Amino acid sequence: MKQYLDLMRHVREHGTFKEDRTGTGTYSVFGYQMRFDLADGFPIVTTKKCHLRSIIHELLWFLQGDTNIKYLKDNGVSIWDEWADENGDLGPVYGYQWRSWPAPNGESIDQIAKLIEMIRKNPDSRRLIVSAWNPALVEQMALPPCHALFQFYVADGKLSCQLYQRSADIFLGVPFNIASYALLTLMVAQVCDLQPGEFIWTGGDCHLYANHIEQADLQLTRQPLPLPTMKLNPEVKDLLAFRFEDFELVGYEAHPHIKAPVAV
């Protein structure tokens, strides 16, 4: 994951200090891109241990259209706890927009179902897009989408994905986001009978929080280790049928976890 360390180093060298919504302050750059060839291994950060269970369960939760943290809590995942209300609700966040985008006629649009249908029927389409950024509902969301829009692309029998992340918490959030969308790409490729291609991460406001600088500098002293392989249950042919047990990360070796506070 040299690409990730290069991003972190770039922000340390060129970032501008900015005040932010949380009151913590950030060092920020605008516009950055990383590319990961999924044939080279599964792009999960190795210079600190990442919590794969949280990554997988969160993605499955998104795909089910769920916006209440009960499923996450039941599976030992706490990454959304700070934003949920007393009933565990988050408002119309990712899962709602992905699966139930409100249409003007009062019905809803299942963007994920439409995406899979389009990849299968018209893989050369330039409209293979899912958006979580709904301006009409942003104010009702506990946290507006950071990873706002993703697009798929099919060429030579390979499926690639590009994510646009408007707000990128480099130390805590971005490692999760890279792994999550790389995993989604593997899943969609399998159910559409395609091979995985590239995952491309594009960031807007790419920032290190002021209280993550010491941790980032520690991480930059570490050498990346070889990437592991993600194995999916080959029997699963329906994207929404994947379960936690259908994933196996083989050969993941990482440096020790580095603790850092979440800016809420």
Swiss-Prot record:
One of its GO terms (molecular function) is thymidylate synthase activity. PANTHER family: THYMIDYLATE SYNTHASE, THYMIDYLATE SYNTHASE 1. The gene is thyA. (6R)-5,10-methylene-5,6,7,8-tetrahydrofolate binds at H51, D169, A263. This is Thymidylate synthase. The active site is at C146. Catalyzes the reductive methylation of 2'-deoxyuridine-5'-monophosphate (dUMP) to 2'-deoxythymidine-5'-monophosphate (dTMP) while utilizing 5,10-methylenetetrahydrofolate (mTHF) as the methyl donor and reductant in the reaction, yielding dihydrofolate (DHF) as a by-product. This enzymatic reaction provides an intracellular de novo source of dTMP, an essential precursor for DNA biosynthesis. SUPFAM superfamilies: Thymidylate synthase/dCMP hydroxymethylase. DUMP binds at R21, R126, R127, R166, S167, A168, D169, N177, H207, L208, Y209. Belongs to the thymidylate synthase family. Bacterial-type ThyA subfamily. It is an enzyme of class 2 (transferase). It catalyses: dUMP + (6R)-5,10-methylene-5,6,7,8-tetrahydrofolate = 7,8-dihydrofolate + dTMP. It comes from Ectopseudomonas mendocina (strain ymp). It is found in: Cytoplasm.
